[in-house]
């Protein structure tokens, strides 16, 4: 929790502390495109509800950029399509909307001609006329109104997006928010969002920096390049103290507004020492990256020399905080830099008190993501320096058991027939065997070590305070008559030789439902993130768990309907509750 001394109660009512990234995140499972992904939130104060929706996104199919390979922080933009080659920068080009969908010109009618000529927007008059052409996505899903404005005097062009929720977005109004050919300013490839305003007069203003030659060795292959095309997100200002219905950029290129919040993207201008709080105003020129690269897909060079080193959240409440610019949160980004390819390897969140005191950091050290495919087979890319959060061998064994090893292991423990070849392959792949043709003693020892690792991984998980769990069994088979008798004798103590799977949330339908009551100190553990089937909320017990039969309620008895109604049945319960023949109440014995 962020604590800022000196806030007035009125100010506190307006501010929500920044949402800090959580540690221990993992790459998501690959979707239908086979790509892994992860999202890292930025330290953005929520204001009164209208704040920038920005985050760092990783995709294993992503290219290089200001956050290293695979990472991006995309703002709303409209771009010329390059799917059919280099744009011609005329009416033959296709435009891509903010969602990546191809835009088509809206049909012109007598009541709604398209295009039209405009001299004003609302009460704001312009010094020149604009030709305004309406566009819409080829496949409609967002239901926004999109207008392309082209100046009839100076040729400046920008986009205006009317969102379905009433918010107005202005993209590329000034040259600072347009990615254009330095040798032909009218050849604009991308228009970046520059300002947004809600119907209530709340604004967000985006500032960008153009690439230059600061701290770049301009000799060798860097000589003679025009590197001014690239735009880097620099600041996002929001929380205007005085509401305003109209866009500020209609009348001014740099709005002189009292902003309460500023999100700063720093490229090394303010220093990256975690012990020194950065200043709001840049102190130095930005740093140059070791692996500069260029893009040419728009027909001109877009050269990138920068890495975003940190993201800073500032509050501007001079009366309450005693200073004009107060740093409250900081996302410090660390890279594995080298001349071949730079990777983001760690992210640390630091929060600050009102007096500049730095609170304990929140570290996000993540395993290395799968790198994008490299052309030409093997790469000379140096070994990654990602700060890897190692999983113990015991947790790895437990995770594999949950995913696919449970069947073989439990059959082996119960003395049932099991696929021996599959068991050997599992032990070999998990490095418990060194050969696929072990002796009987080698196989037995390897299985013993593997099972012990699973049990140790289980015991390392946190204890829980659950008092009842459920389990479904299928006992109404002639071959299981002895087992059924064992389970239906009150006072019997059952010893399950295998790992026993239960759930505190649901009882899965079978002919026998076990209500298993727990005492403090039991050895069952919720698998949580280790579980493969997370929807089951599985609680697993180690082998040789003892269960004492306390009571049995058979179908048709007076108490059966009452007990059945109290069960937390699984989703398929409504379809086939009459499969349940008995409910057995039992208790786990800890000794």
Curated annotation (Swiss-Prot):
The protein's enzyme class: transferase
TM annotation in the entry: none
UniProt main location, coarse: secreted
Catalytic activity, EC: 2.4.2.31
Similarity annotation: Belongs to the SpvB family.
General remark: In Salmonella spp. the spv gene cluster is encoded on a highly transmissible plasmid.
Full protein name: Mono(ADP-ribosyl)transferase SpvB
């Amino acid at each position: 929790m962020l604590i800022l001394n000196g806030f007035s109660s009125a100010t506190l009512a307006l501010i929500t502390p920044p949402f800090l990234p959580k540690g221990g995140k993992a790459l998501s499972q690959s979707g239908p495109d086979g790509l892994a992904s992860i999202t890292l939130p930025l330290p953005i104060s929520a204001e009164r509800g209208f704040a920038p929706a920005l985050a760092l996104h990783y995709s294993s199919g992503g290219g290089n950029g200001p956050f290293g390979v695979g990472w991006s922080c995309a703002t709303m933009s409209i771009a010329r399509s390059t799917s059919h080659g280099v744009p011609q920068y005329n009416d033959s080009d296709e435009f891509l909307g903010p969602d990546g969908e191809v835009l088509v010109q809206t049909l012109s009618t007598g009541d709604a001609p398209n295009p039209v000529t405009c001299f004003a927007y609302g009460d704001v008059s312009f010094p020149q006329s604009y030709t305004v052409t309406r566009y819409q996505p080829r496949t409609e899903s967002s239901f926004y109104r999109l207008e392309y404005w082209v100046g009839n005097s100076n040729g400046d062009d920008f986009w205006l997006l009317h969102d379905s929720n009433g918010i107005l977005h202005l993209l590329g109004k000034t040259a600072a928010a347009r990615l254009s050919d330095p040798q032909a300013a009218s050849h604009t490839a991308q228009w970046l969002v520059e300002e947004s305003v809600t119907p209530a007069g709340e604004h967000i203003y985006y500032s960008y920096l153009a690439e230059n030659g600061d701290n770049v060795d301009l000799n060798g292959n860097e000589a003679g390049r025009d590197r001014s095309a690239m735009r880097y997100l620099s600041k996002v200002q929001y929380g205007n103290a005085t509401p305003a219905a109209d866009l500020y950029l209609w009348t001014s290129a740099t709005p002189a507004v009292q902003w309460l919040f500023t999100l700063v993207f720093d490229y090394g201008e303010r220093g990256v020492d975690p012990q020194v709080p950065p200043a709001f105003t840049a102190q130095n020129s930005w740093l140059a990256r070791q692996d500069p690269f260029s893009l040419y897909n728009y027909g001109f060079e877009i050269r990138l020399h920068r890495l975003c080193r940190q993201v800073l959240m500032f509050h501007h409440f001079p009366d309450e905080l005693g200073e004009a610019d107060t740093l409250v949160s900081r996302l410090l980004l660390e890279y594995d830099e080298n001349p071949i390819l730079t990777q983001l390897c760690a992210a640390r969140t630091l929060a600050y008190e009102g007096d500049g005191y730095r609170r304990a950091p929140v570290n996000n050290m993540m395993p290395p993501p799968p790198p994008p495919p490299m052309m030409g087979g093997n790469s000379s890319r140096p070994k990654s320096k990602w700060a890897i959060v190692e999983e113990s061998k015991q947790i790895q064994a437990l995770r594999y058991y949950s995913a696919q090893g449970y069947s073989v292991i439990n059959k082996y423990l119960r003395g049932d027939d099991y696929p021996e070849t599959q068991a050997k392959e599992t032990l070999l792949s998990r490095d418990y065997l060194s050969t696929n043709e072990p002796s009987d003693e080698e196989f037995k020892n390897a299985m013993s070590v593997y099972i012990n690792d699973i049990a140790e991984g289980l015991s390392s998980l946190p204890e829980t305070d659950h008092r009842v769990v459920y389990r479904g069994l299928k006992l109404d088979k002639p071959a299981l008559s002895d087992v059924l008798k064992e389970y239906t004798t009150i006072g019997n103590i059952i010893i399950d030789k295998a790992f026993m799977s239960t759930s505190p949330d649901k009882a899965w339908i079978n002919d026998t439902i076990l209500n298993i009551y727990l005492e403090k100190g039991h050895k069952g553990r919720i698998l949580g993130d280790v579980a493969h089937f997370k929807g089951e909320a599985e609680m697993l017990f180690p082998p040789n768990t003892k269960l004492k039969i306390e009571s049995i309620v058979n179908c048709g008895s007076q108490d059966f309907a009452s007990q059945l109604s109290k069960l937390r049945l699984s989703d398929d319960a409504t379809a086939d509750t009459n499969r349940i023949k008995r409910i057995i109440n039992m208790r786990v014995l800890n000794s």
